[in-house]
């Protein structure tokens, strides 16, 4: 578990080696970049340790962030991230948290676009390691072999919001709790979409 790269992004100045723009120094955005670089370096040292101690080729490495780094609801962060990305920083970027798995001896790579959450990590890793998960209280599913991808999103957005990779939809419920006043985005490019009320209502009911 790494905590340095977590708000409030406090890092000893002796470890903050990135040269930032003057306008970013001391800002939440600037501090975030410094801790990202530091965490990346620390992770590199872990990899070096595994290799040095003959553990790397016998270790499955899984990396996942439990939530986004920069909150778009904070105006100063929203502006900084939009400027940094060169496009609007919206929920499609904020909620896009990667789950990376390295398997020793597997000389191929794959990108899976199935939507999932932390509840799906254990079943995914267990299947890769051929572990039996047929127990009464195992939640989630194997993301690499899932029939669908669906997340009921409740953090930062209202109950009834959802993300589904089946229809490439990211939907946020309206502030009045209705689907009609909500907002629909494409998972593919973040573009705004017209709301199909019947389809969105089905997914929204499921999310609740």
Q: How would you label these PLM feature ranges?
A:
Residues 1-208:
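Solvent-exposed soluble domains appended to multi-pass membrane proteins
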